[in-house]
Protein backbone atom coordinates (compact mmCIF):
# COMPACT_ATOMS: atom_id res chain seq x y z
CA UNK A 1 0.00 0.00 0.00
CA UNK A 2 2.87 2.34 0.77
CA UNK A 3 4.52 1.57 -2.58
CA UNK A 4 1.33 2.57 -4.45
CA UNK A 5 1.17 5.82 -2.55
CA UNK A 6 4.75 6.75 -3.44
CA UNK A 7 4.14 5.84 -7.09
CA UNK A 8 1.07 8.07 -7.15
CA UNK A 9 3.07 10.87 -5.57
CA UNK A 10 5.82 10.42 -8.16
CA UNK A 11 3.29 10.41 -11.00
CA UNK A 12 1.68 13.57 -9.66
CA UNK A 13 5.08 15.21 -9.38
CA UNK A 14 5.95 14.26 -12.99
CA UNK A 15 2.58 15.59 -14.19
CA UNK A 16 3.11 18.87 -12.35
CA UNK A 17 6.59 19.30 -13.84
CA UNK A 18 5.34 18.48 -17.34
CA UNK A 19 2.42 20.90 -16.98
CA UNK A 20 4.77 23.65 -15.79
CA UNK A 21 7.08 22.97 -18.76
CA UNK A 22 4.19 23.12 -21.24
CA UNK A 23 2.94 26.37 -19.71
CA UNK A 24 6.43 27.88 -19.91
CA UNK A 25 6.72 26.89 -23.59
CA UNK A 26 3.32 28.38 -24.36
CA UNK A 27 4.29 31.63 -22.66
CA UNK A 28 7.51 31.79 -24.70
CA UNK A 29 5.64 31.07 -27.95
CA UNK A 30 3.06 33.69 -27.11
CA UNK A 31 5.78 36.25 -26.39
CA UNK A 32 7.55 35.54 -29.68
CA UNK A 33 4.23 35.80 -31.56
CA UNK A 34 3.59 39.18 -29.97
CA UNK A 35 7.07 40.40 -30.91
CA UNK A 36 6.66 39.19 -34.50
CA UNK A 37 3.29 40.93 -34.81
CA UNK A 38 4.76 44.13 -33.37
CA UNK A 39 7.68 44.06 -35.81
CA UNK A 40 5.33 43.41 -38.70
CA UNK A 41 3.14 46.34 -37.63
CA UNK A 42 6.21 48.59 -37.36
CA UNK A 43 7.38 47.64 -40.86
CA UNK A 44 3.90 48.23 -42.25
CA UNK A 45 3.67 51.66 -40.60
CA UNK A 46 7.13 52.63 -41.88
CA UNK A 47 6.22 51.58 -45.41
CA UNK A 48 2.97 53.55 -45.24
CA UNK A 49 4.86 56.64 -44.03
CA UNK A 50 7.31 56.36 -46.93
CA UNK A 51 4.42 55.96 -49.36
CA UNK A 52 2.69 59.06 -47.97
CA UNK A 53 5.91 61.09 -48.20
CA UNK A 54 6.30 60.18 -51.88
CA UNK A 55 2.64 60.99 -52.59
CA UNK A 56 3.01 64.37 -50.86
CA UNK A 57 5.83 65.19 -53.25
CA UNK A 58 4.11 64.10 -56.45
CA UNK A 59 0.48 65.18 -55.86
CA UNK A 60 -1.06 68.60 -55.43
CA UNK A 61 -3.18 69.04 -52.27
CA UNK A 62 -6.41 68.72 -54.29
CA UNK A 63 -5.21 65.50 -55.92
CA UNK A 64 -4.19 64.08 -52.52
CA UNK A 65 -7.63 64.90 -51.18
CA UNK A 66 -9.28 63.12 -54.13
CA UNK A 67 -7.04 60.08 -53.64
CA UNK A 68 -7.91 59.96 -49.92
CA UNK A 69 -11.62 60.11 -50.73
CA UNK A 70 -11.19 57.38 -53.33
CA UNK A 71 -9.35 55.15 -50.86
CA UNK A 72 -12.21 55.47 -48.37
CA UNK A 73 -14.88 54.56 -50.89
CA UNK A 74 -12.93 52.04 -53.02
CA UNK A 75 -9.78 50.90 -51.16
CA UNK A 76 -8.59 48.45 -53.83
CA UNK A 77 -8.65 51.03 -56.61
CA UNK A 78 -7.06 53.64 -54.33
CA UNK A 79 -4.18 51.29 -53.48
CA UNK A 80 -3.72 50.36 -57.13
CA UNK A 81 -3.58 54.02 -58.13
CA UNK A 82 -1.11 54.82 -55.34
CA UNK A 83 1.21 52.04 -56.47
CA UNK A 84 0.97 53.18 -60.08
CA UNK A 85 1.78 56.78 -59.12
CA UNK A 86 4.71 55.73 -56.94
CA UNK A 87 6.17 53.54 -59.68
CA UNK A 88 5.84 56.41 -62.17
CA UNK A 89 7.60 58.74 -59.75
CA UNK A 90 10.39 56.27 -59.00
CA UNK A 91 11.01 55.63 -62.68
CA UNK A 92 11.26 59.39 -63.31
CA UNK A 93 8.30 59.59 -65.68
CA UNK A 94 6.56 62.40 -63.79
CA UNK A 95 7.86 65.79 -64.92
CA UNK A 96 5.89 67.75 -62.29
CA UNK A 97 3.27 67.37 -59.59
CA UNK A 98 0.06 65.66 -60.65
CA UNK A 99 -2.96 67.93 -60.49
CA UNK A 100 -6.50 66.93 -59.65
CA UNK A 101 -7.44 66.93 -63.36
CA UNK A 102 -4.50 64.69 -64.26
CA UNK A 103 -5.49 62.33 -61.45
CA UNK A 104 -9.05 62.20 -62.80
CA UNK A 105 -7.66 61.32 -66.23
CA UNK A 106 -5.57 58.50 -64.75
CA UNK A 107 -8.63 57.21 -62.93
CA UNK A 108 -10.67 57.21 -66.13
CA UNK A 109 -7.95 55.21 -67.88
CA UNK A 110 -7.93 52.68 -65.04
CA UNK A 111 -11.68 52.10 -65.16
CA UNK A 112 -12.90 49.49 -67.63
CA UNK A 113 -15.05 50.72 -70.47
CA UNK A 114 -18.71 50.43 -69.65
CA UNK A 115 -21.07 49.38 -72.34
CA UNK A 116 -24.16 51.48 -72.47
CA UNK A 117 -27.35 49.59 -72.99
CA UNK A 118 -30.65 51.18 -73.68
CA UNK A 119 -34.04 49.63 -73.76
CA UNK A 120 -36.55 50.88 -76.29
CA UNK A 121 -40.16 49.93 -76.10
CA UNK A 122 -41.99 49.10 -79.25
Curated annotation (Swiss-Prot):
Keyword Transmembrane listed: no
Record GO terms (molecular function): DNA binding
Cystine residue pairs: none
InterPro entries assigned: DNA_bind_arc (IPR022889), PDCD5-like (IPR002836), PDCD5-like_sf (IPR036883)
UniProt keyword annotation of DNA-binding present: yes
One Pfam family here: dsDNA_bind
UniProt entry keywords in alphabetical sequence: DNA-binding
Superkingdom as given in the UniProt entry: Archaea
GO cellular component terms listed in the entry, alphabetical order: cytosol
Gene3D superfamilies assigned to the protein according to its UniProt record, in alphabetical order: PDCD5-like (1.10.8.140)
Family (UniProt): Belongs to the PDCD5 family.
Protein name: DNA-binding protein Mbar_A0455
Protein source organism: Methanosarcina barkeri (strain Fusaro / DSM 804)
Lineage of source species: Archaea, Methanobacteriati, Methanobacteriota, Stenosarchaea group, Methanomicrobia
Amino acid sequence: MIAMSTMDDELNEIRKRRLAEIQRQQAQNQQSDIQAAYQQEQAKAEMEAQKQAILRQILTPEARERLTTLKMSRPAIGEQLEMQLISLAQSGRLPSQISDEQLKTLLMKMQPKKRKTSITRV
